[in-house]
Amino acid sequence: MAAEAARAAADASLDGWAPLVADASGCATIGDVMEDGRATAILRWYASHARDLPWRRPDAGPWAILVSEIMLQQTPVSRVLPAYEAWLARWPTPSALAAASPADAVRQWGRLGYPRRAIRLHAAARAITEEHGGRVPDSMSALLALPGVGSYTAAAVASFAFGQRHAVLDTNVRRVLARLMRGHPRAPASPTVMEVRLAESLLPAVPGLAPRWSVAVMELGALVCTADRPRCPDCPVVSACAWHRAGRPADDPALGRRRGQGYEGTDRQCRGRLLAVLRDSGGPVPAARLGAAWPDEDQRARSLASLVADGLAESLPGGRYALPR
């Protein structure tokens, strides 16, 4: 019964979707999607298969959504969940985080990866506290002015936290649209003007429905239309998918090949080792202790310098290092 009610709600809410928009580039538009039922099918699928994630719940406020969006950048949901819950338990509001030190933020971030996000989130919390009275702003311009908030994160927060009509183009959404609408196995390395125009043309005109559409396409890409081994038989729009109809052609050489980035022995691994020593210490760490964490002196010096440049560490007198104060 719940699934049937969700389907009925999805069908009813589609009545006010935008009309056909001509696209000189040849992209399919909302009129094409509605004509063959793809939009309805995706929303029905989402109503029955959406994961219960804390940042999607009705009680998740703008701050929680901002934290989740920053944590989810280049990080799997399974790793984000415990970090997200611990972070909000400690700092449930921007002002609570703003009162803490950058070192506290880095320590709490732990091994989630890409720790500059912790510094930027801390800086954003201070900006929200000092410039917006402790409330996450709801305008795109104000969101974009926050430290560490780019166009994707601003659109996601404006959409999911405030119900606004913005195209939310993450990796999953871009891959679904590339396959479904354009017949390409994947999207280009960076969003193009054509992609943005297509995504915007597909947004529902009904107030409040655009966020549901965006998260439904996002979920489809995360669970079914995955980068590797897509589960096409489980896709609600497989029969209308341009890529599937074309026989699932391989990568277009014009898009350029993506090569997986190694980790072992890289500066990134070195930085992680050194930062772990600083994070786990109760105060400044002598250079000799850092030397035990990474024996290659040149690489260690280069990585330490980059940690300092990124605001993740401070160089102190006597050859000591510490987390930022």
Regions found by a protein language model. Give the residues of each.
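Extreme N-terminal basic, low-complexity initiation segments
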Residues: 2-15
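Intrinsically disordered, low-complexity segments enriched in serine/threonine/proline/glycine
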Residues: 12, 21-22
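Short, positively charged and aromatic/hydrophobic N-terminal segments
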Residues: 29-30
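Catalytic cores of DNA base-excision repair glycosylases
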Residues: 41, 45-271, 277-288, 293-298, ...
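Short amphipathic alpha-helical interaction segments
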Residues: 294-308
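Residues in the recognition helix of alpha-helical DNA-binding motifs
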Residues: 303-306, 320-324
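A short, conserved structural fragment
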Residues: 308-319
